[in-house]
């Protein structure tokens, strides 16, 4: 009898004095501090890192190109993940409770899905852009213009927002799972149970663009390899100014494709565990332990913080732009026309 009483006392609730409250599964104080530091660092990096990317591309006129506008829009999606998703998911993960209300739970879930797909669509369009740039660099400026980039950006935002809003604000995502959804619907929880049809739709929506990107980047690197061999074979010969220009353009586009290819690979690695886990869960009766699910979620969230690090590692112009912004030189009238590129490509 005494052991049962102590067990009841040990149970903690998200809202101690509210009927129907979710059970709270607390971490130790030390673990909570570590988790808040790890997750908080990711959120801060996602917000300020992507903010630097957006400011750099929008402020410096030298960076105003169709590709970079897509990159800035991608950074905006990752920035919004850092603002609207990661801080609240951090509290939910560490405290094992949702303290922000049911309405905001729906909004949070909607943002989570919408910005994920927005990132995926942006990366898919960037892959197409890079494919054209590398395979036909001299014709590329006439094919992928600023207006085409604007259309791609619009599609990358409108479709995910419409899809996410339609699925989560109409409640169709849990059709056929009403009993399970009601059982999990306690006060202080924000668990979204998605049925097999929508999980399969989500998985295909992730897999098909990912497959397209793999094909495109595979072709990009095959073409880049052929171009590099061609340049190497003709390197000892005297080049005309026209051939020299073609070589410089091709080299620049290959370098950009390589960097953005790393971004695509990082996205795939980050989101693949979550996508596979969601698919398995829906068809195997939601068997994934909570800790595994949270790890998959945070691997995906951390992708929003990775892109600025990739740009800083591979793009000298981004490092220079950061220095100009952080030191306050960006406030000078002449900063917008500053040269961020080295003379040699």
Swiss-Prot record:
Keywords: Cell membrane, Disulfide bond, G-protein coupled receptor, Glycoprotein, Membrane, Receptor, Transducer, Transmembrane, Transmembrane helix. The chain crosses the membrane at residues 33-53, 69-89, 108-128, 148-168, 203-223, 260-276, 283-302. It is found in: Cell membrane. It is a multi-pass membrane protein. SUPFAM superfamilies: Family A G protein-coupled receptor-like. Belongs to the G-protein coupled receptor 1 family. Residues 1-32, 90-107, 169-202, 277-282 are extracellular. The gene is TAAR6. One of its GO terms (cellular component) is plasma membrane. Its main location: membrane. Coiled coil: none annotated. GO terms for biological process: adenylate cyclase-activating G protein-coupled receptor signaling pathway; G protein-coupled receptor signaling pathway; sensory perception of smell. SMART domains: 7TM_GPCR_Srsx. Residues 54-68, 129-147, 224-259, 303-345 are cytoplasmic. Disulfide bonds join 22-186, 105-190. This is Trace amine-associated receptor 6. In addition to the well known disulfide bond common to G-protein coupled receptor 1 family, trace amine-associated receptors (TAARs) contain an unique disulfide bond (Cys-22-Cys-186) connecting the N-terminus to the extracellular Loop 2 (ECL2), which is required for agonist-induced receptor activation. Olfactory receptor specific for trace amines, such as beta-phenylethylamine (beta-PEA). Trace amine compounds are enriched in animal body fluids and act on trace amine-associated receptors (TAARs) to elicit both intraspecific and interspecific innate behaviors. Beta-PEA-binding causes a conformation change that triggers signaling via G(s)-class of G alpha proteins (GNAL or GNAS). Glycans are attached at residues 4, 19. The lineage of its organism: Eukaryota, Metazoa, Chordata, Craniata, Vertebrata. Expressed at low abundance in various brain tissues, as well as in fetal liver, but not in the cerebellum or placenta. In the brain, comparable levels of expression in basal ganglia, frontal cortex, substantia nigra, amygdala and hippocampus, highest expression in hippocampus and lowest expression in basal ganglia. GO terms for molecular function: G protein-coupled receptor activity; trace-amine receptor activity. InterPro entries: GPCR_Rhodpsn, GPCR_Rhodpsn_7TM, TAAR, TAAR_fam.
């Amino acid at each position: 009898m005494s052991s049962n009483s102590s067990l009841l006392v040990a149970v903690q609730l998200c809202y101690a004095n509210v009927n129907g409250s979710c059970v709270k599964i607390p971490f130790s104080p030390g673990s909570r501090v570590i988790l808040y530091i790890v997750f908080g660092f990711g959120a801060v990096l996602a917000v300020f890192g992507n903010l630097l990317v957006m400011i750099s591309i929008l402020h410096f006129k030298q960076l105003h190109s169709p590709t970079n506008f897509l990159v800035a829009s991608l950074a905006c999606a990752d920035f919004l993940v850092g603002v609207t998703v990661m801080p609240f998911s951090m509290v939910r993960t560490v405290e094992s409770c949702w303290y922000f209300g049911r309405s905001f739970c729906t909004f949070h879930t909607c943002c989570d899905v919408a910005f994920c797909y927005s990132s995926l669509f942006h990366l898919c369009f960037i892959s197409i852009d890079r494919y054209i740039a590398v395979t036909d660099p001299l014709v590329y400026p006439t094919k992928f213009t600023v207006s085409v980039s604007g259309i791609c950006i619009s599609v990358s935002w409108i479709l995910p927002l419409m899809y996410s809003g339609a699925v989560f604000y109409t409640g169709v995502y849990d059709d056929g799972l009403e009993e399970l959804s009601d059982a999990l619907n306690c006060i202080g929880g924000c668990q979204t149970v998605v049925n097999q049809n929508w999980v399969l739709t989500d998985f295909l929506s992730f897999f098909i663009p990912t497959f397209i990107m793999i094909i495109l980047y595979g072709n990009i690197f095959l073409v880049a390899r052929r171009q590099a061999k061609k340049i190497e074979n003709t390197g000892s010969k005297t080049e005309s100014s026209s051939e020299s220009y073609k070589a410089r353009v091709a080299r620049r586009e290959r370098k950009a494709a390589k960097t953005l290819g790393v971004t695509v690979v990082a996205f795939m690695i980050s989101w693949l565990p979550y996508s596979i886990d969601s698919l398995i869960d829906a068809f195997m009766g939601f068997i994934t332990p909570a800790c595994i699910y949270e790890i998959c979620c945070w691997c995906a969230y951390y992708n929003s913080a990775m892109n600025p690090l990739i740009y800083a590692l591979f793009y000298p112009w981004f490092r220079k732009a950061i220095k100009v912004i952080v030191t306050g030189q960006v406030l000078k009238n002449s900063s917008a026309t500053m040269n961020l590129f080295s003379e040699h490509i």
